Amino acid sequence: MLFFKSIASLAALVSLAVASPIESRQSATTCGSTNYSASQVRAAANAACQYYQNDDTAGSSTYPHTYNNYEGFDFPVDGPYQEFPIKSGGVYTGGSPGADRVVINTNCEYAGAITHTGASGNNFVGCSGTN
């Protein structure tokens, strides 16, 4: 009897897991020597999404704008992609973008975080968690 209860419980858990979609979650990251909390990453990605969906940019900047992934990062979501600055002092609203970016796709799914810090020329390298 205990065996059948265990099997029934396991079946219930599996059905819950199958019914729950898996989404890409923004997590904390480090770009160069700058640490960003999960909430900072989420805020930047959400701002990028809002501007993108409203066909708008932050201040007089060009962000968000197309990110072509010339570096060949293996993002967990398909493109096309948009890049948007992430700043430690709050959400980017224009001006100097700094070196660090969040990347979203045009469905507003978080793809990763990248930085110019440590990259040659105008290229990017992945922040922690982005390969």
From Swiss-Prot:
Catalytic activity: [RNA] containing guanosine + H2O = an [RNA fragment]-3'-guanosine-3'-phosphate + a 5'-hydroxy-ribonucleotide-3'-[RNA fragment]
Keyword Lyase appears in the UniProt entry: yes
Top-level enzyme category: lyase
Signal sequence, renumbered to the chain: 1-25
Cross-referenced InterPro entries: N1-like (IPR000026), Ribonuclease/ribotoxin (IPR016191), Ribonuclease_N1/T1 (IPR051386), RNase_U2 (IPR048269)
GO terms, molecular function: lyase activity; ribonuclease T1 activity; RNA binding; RNA endonuclease activity
Residue numbers annotated as active site: 65, 83, 116
One Pfam family of this chain: Ribonuclease
Keywords: Disulfide bond, Endonuclease, Hydrolase, Lyase, Nuclease, Pyrrolidone carboxylic acid, Signal
Modified residues (Pyrrolidone carboxylic acid): 26
Transmembrane segments: none
EC number: 4.6.1.24
Disulfide bridges in this chain: 31-127, 49-108
Family: Belongs to the ribonuclease N1/T1 family.
Protein name: Guanyl-specific ribonuclease F1
Protein species of origin: Fusarium fujikuroi (Bakanae and foot rot disease fungus)
